[in-house]
Amino acid sequence: MGIKVVATNKVAYHNYNIIETYEAGIVLKGSEVKSIREGSVNLRDSFVRIDNGEAFIYNMYIAPYKPASKLQHDPYRKRKLLLHKREILKLMGKVQEKGLTIIPTKVYLKNGKVKIEIALAKGKAKYEKREAIKERDMKRELSKKYKGKIKL
């Protein structure tokens, strides 16, 4: 079947420097899986926290599945992530030591299963964000100016 990307967290790449990424499974209800297959998921403002040796994702919005009338899920409930114990311990150590955070970057379907890509990230300062925007604008201007003449 392959991989089908359902949602990406574009804001994460603007606000954070991504250090490492991990693939995790996620515990979902049936209506949540159907909503994700439709693409009704939003990762903005979501984050991962490790509680009692288990990883949970908070503030991940999964829209209610419209055809399911009676049994609806809470769109913002906390959901358990499925990671190996050594991965959780490694993430816990890095988050406590260096002031890093764990954020979701992508939700995708892999061989029919819903997977989430989480990243160990460090927040960018305001000036770093401004520099990235300036650099992007300069590249865009150069590519417009020399369209087809040089490659960047």
From Swiss-Prot:
The GO annotation for biological process reads:
trans-translation
One Pfam family matching this protein: SmpB
Q: Name one GO cellular component term.
A: cytosol
What UniProt keywords apply to this chain's record, in alphabetical order? Answer: Cytoplasm, RNA-binding
| Protein localization | Cytoplasm
SUPFAM superfamilies cross-referenced by the UniProt entry: Small protein B (SmpB)
Report whether Cytoplasm shows up as a keyword of the record: yes
Source organism, top-level taxon: Bacteria
Instruction: Specify where it is mainly localized.
Output: cytoplasm
Under the GO molecular function aspect, what terms does this record hold? RNA binding
Function, please? Answer: Required for rescue of stalled ribosomes mediated by trans-translation. Binds to transfer-messenger RNA (tmRNA), required for stable association of tmRNA with ribosomes. tmRNA and SmpB together mimic tRNA shape, replacing the anticodon stem-loop with SmpB. tmRNA is encoded by the ssrA gene; the 2 termini fold to resemble tRNA(Ala) and it encodes a 'tag peptide', a short internal open reading frame. During trans-translation Ala-aminoacylated tmRNA acts like a tRNA, entering the A-site of stalled ribosomes, displacing the stalled mRNA.
Q: What family name appears in the similarity comment?
A: Belongs to the SmpB family.
Q: Entry's NCBIfam families?
A: PRK05422.1, smpB
Would you tell me the protein name for this molecule?
A: SsrA-binding protein
Species name: Persephonella marina (strain DSM 14350 / EX-H1)
